[in-house]
Amino acid sequence: MMWGAGSSMAWFSAGSGSVNVSSVDPVEEPTGPATLLPSPRAWDVVLCISGTLVSCENALVVAIIVGTPAFRAPMFLLVGSLAVADLLAGLGLVLHFAADFCIGSPEMSLMLVGVLAMAFTASIGSLLAITVDRYLSLYNALTYYSETTVTRTYVMLALVWVGALGLGLVPVLAWNCRDGLTTCGVVYPLSKNHLVVLAIAFFMVFGIMLQLYAQICRIVCRHAQQIALQRHLLPASHYVATRKGIATLAVVLGAFAACWLPFTVYCLLGDADSPRLYTYLTLLPATYNSMINPVIYAFRNQDVQKVLWAICCCCSTSKIPFRSRSPSDV
């Protein structure tokens, strides 16, 4: 999609070589009033389908959080921010497909590249904010539920979305390679230098998340040991509970790394002459991160599951008993 030159993503080829600025093989200028639109390739269709699934999943999460008054706690605000970002990413993929292969508008395609850059940045930023919130809820357990927590949540969300908006506007307003394809990176029309900056920012975020989750593991192990001693539980019970908690954190961080690390590394190593196939193969898992985020951060929550069951049964959600849950449960 956004990695095709000109008005489309279809300067893709299975091997390396010079960049083709047209969407298909060179053709004569059209003699009629109609504009020749490129034909989508299999990878383009797969990404469009992925965008549709991402949009549907996250639209459901947004609808649940907005439509359920009980979901106004800071942790649900952060999950809602993540869902909105992933929803924009899914819609951006679908609309970019339409802009390239149905409308043929280079200007619309460029704007949607900015939307995708903003959405994916906001998604990663929201994941970092959720990690920070989880850590603080355990580190400052006694003072977590206060007005300060709400204020801090809004500040984090503001920083995430302002930063994402800035990074999304950069390729639209100035920093792109539409006028100089030799400066392009693996994703058109983002320049190589721009992608390097984004990759470095990702590694910084990933490093912070890794450090915070390591601290969370230490706190969880210490708390589990203290509870086991107070309740005179067997050591086996302590280790089982601790191992389960650490396994959950490993799944959360591992899914994030598996989805984004291949594409980020490829952005650093590749350039405009790199095989287009590798761009698709590394970018597709990155879109899957927006597909699994609702499962990890929303649908696993028991209160969200209650609302889903109520919706499926056409029942009112106003009488559903919700229990107080900490961010580490989300």
From Swiss-Prot:
| Keyword terms of this UniProt record | Cell membrane, G-protein coupled receptor, Glycoprotein, Lipoprotein, Membrane, Palmitate, Phosphoprotein, Receptor, Transducer, Transmembrane, Transmembrane helix
* Residue intervals passing through the bilayer: 43-62, 75-98, 111-132, 154-173, 199-217, 246-272, 278-299
Q: Which residues form a coiled coil?
A: none
The subcellular localization recorded is: Cell membrane
Stretches in topological domain Cytoplasmic: 63-74, 133-153, 218-245, 300-330
| Modified residues annotated as Phosphoserine in this record | 324, 326, 328
List the S-palmitoyl cysteine lipid attachment residues.
Answer: 313
- What is the membrane topology here? Multi-pass membrane protein
Chief subcellular location equals membrane
Q: Quote the cellular component terms of the Gene Ontology held in the record.
A: plasma membrane
**Which ranges of this chain reside in the Extracellular compartment per its record?**
1-42, 99-110, 174-198, 273-277
This protein is called: G-protein coupled receptor 3
